Regions:
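Generic structural signal for well-ordered alpha-helices
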Residues: 29, 66, 87, 91, ...
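Conserved residues at the C-terminal ends of beta-strands
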Residues: 45, 80-83, 136-139, 166, ...
Length: 220
C-alpha cells in the first residue's frame, strides 16, 4: 500500500484528522450530541485482553494500559458481562491505581428478562466498583425492549449517565434504524472498518439526526 492509498483509506474512515493531530501532539475530543460532554475518540476495549486471573504477570501490563490511557488524556473503557472477568479486573486495577474516578466506564447488559437484567447490571456496578456507571448499553440488542425501559428509568434517576445499544452485524441494521427512530439514545456501538462501511451510509446519518454518538468499533 502506497502513501496516497493509505491517506485515502484513513480519510474514508474519518481517521486522518486523528492521525494528523497525534503527529502534532494535540488531544482530539468529540462531543456527545445529547449532552455536549467531550470525550477522546479512542478508548480501551476489554474483550479477552482484561479477562485474566490474579497473576501479576497478567495484570501488571494491564495496569500499564490504564496508566497510559489516563496519561494520554483518554478515559473511555468498554466492557461487558460477556467478557468473562474483565469487569472485575477493570474495577480492581483502576481502584488499586486510584484511577477509577478518572475513567469513563461503559459496560452492557447481556441477558434476558427484566429482573435478570437488573441483577446483572447491579452486579456490574459492584465489579466495576462504581455507584454510577457512565454508559450502560444493551449488548447485541438482547431483549432490548425490556432492558430499554430499565435503562430509561435508571438514567432519569441518575444511576447511569448515558444509555445505548450495540451490535456487530449488518443484518441487524434495519432493526437498529427503527430503534433509533423511535427511542432517544445517547450511544450506538456498531461495526465499522475498511471492510465494513455500510454503517456510514445507513446508520451514522440517522444517529447524527437523533443525537446519538456513533461509537465505532472496528472489525479488523
Amino acid at each position: 500500500m502506497n502513501r496516497r492509498t493509505c491517506l485515502h483509506n484513513l480519510s474514508a474512515l474519518g481517521l486522518l484528522p486523528l492521525i494528523t493531530s497525534m503527529q502534532e501532539n494535540k488531544v482530539i475530543k468529540r462531543v456527545i450530541p445529547s449532552s455536549g460532554e467531550q470525550l477522546t475518540p479512542v478508548g480501551v476495549g476489554t474483550w479477552q485482553t482484561f479477562d485474566v486471573g490474579n497473576d501479576s504477570a497478567e495484570r501488571d501490563p494491564l495496569k500499564g494500559v490504564l496508566r497510559t490511557l489516563i496519561e494520554k488524556a483518554g478515559s473511555v473503557i468498554d466492557s461487558s458481562p460477556m467478557y468473562g472477568r474483565s469487569e472485575k479486573v477493570v474495577g480492581e486495577l483502576s481502584t488499586e491505581l486510584s484511577l477509577n474516578s478518572k475513567l469513563f466506564i461503559a459496560t452492557k447488559v447481556w441477558t434476558t428478562g427484566q429482573q435478570e437484567g437488573i441483577r446483572q447490571m447491579n452486579n456490574s456496578f459492584s465489579l466495576l466498583k462504581r455507584e454510577k456507571i457512565d454508559l450502560m448499553q444493551i449488548h447485541n440488542l438482547m431483549d432490548w425492549q425490556i432492558h430499554l425501559k430499565t435503562l430509561r428509568s435508571w438514567k432519569e434517576s441518575g444511576k447511569v449517565r448515558y444509555i445505548g445499544i450495540t451490535h456487530y452485524q449488518e443484518s441487524t441494521y434495519s432493526t437498529i434504524e427503527q430503534i433509533l427512530k423511535n427511542n432517544p439514545l445517547d450511544f450506538l456501538q456498531i461495526n465499522y472498518s475498511l471492510l465494513s462501511r455500510k454503517a456510514a451510509e445507513r446508520l451514522f446519518p440517522l444517529a447524527e439526526e437523533k443525537k446519538s454518538r456513533s461509537d465505532n468499533q472496528p472489525t479488523v
